[in-house]
Design a protein with these regions (language model features):
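Conserved catalytic core of the tyrosine transesterase superfamily
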Residues: 1-177
Length: 177
């Protein structure tokens, strides 16, 4: 794709460099009290996107065509649709923010169509094997068995398990808070 020259749109009220736009957006996310992990996700998406923009220095230079060029390059580089959709979700929030602040022209951003993948469920034998108590005194095997049973029983994510503390467990009522 060729180099684009920017023509300032008179309807846009502010012209900000990408780095400054990113800072304003991330501060807005902090003011909204978004989780640090969400803010990190947005920051990583923006930095990845900005690194792949050729000659684009200002937010008002980001157009649907620029975004689609980015996606085509990613597809040609072998990126999976699921990964691209994850990026699109973060960038869509940024684009909407920029359009609301009149830093750039609004444009619709839709997720890419993914082929349905059918994951094979575990067989009854595999589930029984996963839930079977270890036949050893090795601590690691007991830990792994406990974690698998915890995941199966609660459906919690790994990040929840990592942050779980003894004070979060009511052993008498057998409840986790």
């Amino acid at each position: 794709m060729g180099h684009r020259t920017s023509i300032k749109n008179p309807r846009l009220t502010k012209r900000l460099p990408l780095e400054e736009t990113e800072t304003v957006f991330l501060n807005h996310c902090r003011i909204k009290n978004l989780s640090p992990r969400t803010i990190q996700y947005y920051q990583e998406d923006l930095e990845y996107f900005f690194a792949h923009l050729d000659g684009i220095r200002y937010a008002d230079e980001i157009t649907r065509e620029v975004f689609e060029d980015f996606l085509i390059k990613q597809i040609n580089a072998g990126k999976k649709i699921t990964s691209l959709n994850t990026r699109i979700r973060g960038l869509r929030v940024f684009f909407k923010f920029c359009a609301e602040r009149e830093y750039m022209e609004p444009f619709a951003v839709k997720l890419m169509k993914e082929d349905d993948t059918v994951k094979e469920p575990y067989t009854d034998a595999e589930i029984a094997r996963l839930l079977q108590k270890p036949k050893t005194n090795r601590w690691v095997e007991w830990r792994n068995w406990a974690l698998v049973n915890y995941f199966v029983a609660t459906g919690n994510r790994a990040s929840t398990v990592v942050n779980l503390r003894v004070k979060d467990i009511d052993f008498e009522k057998m409840t986790i808070f």
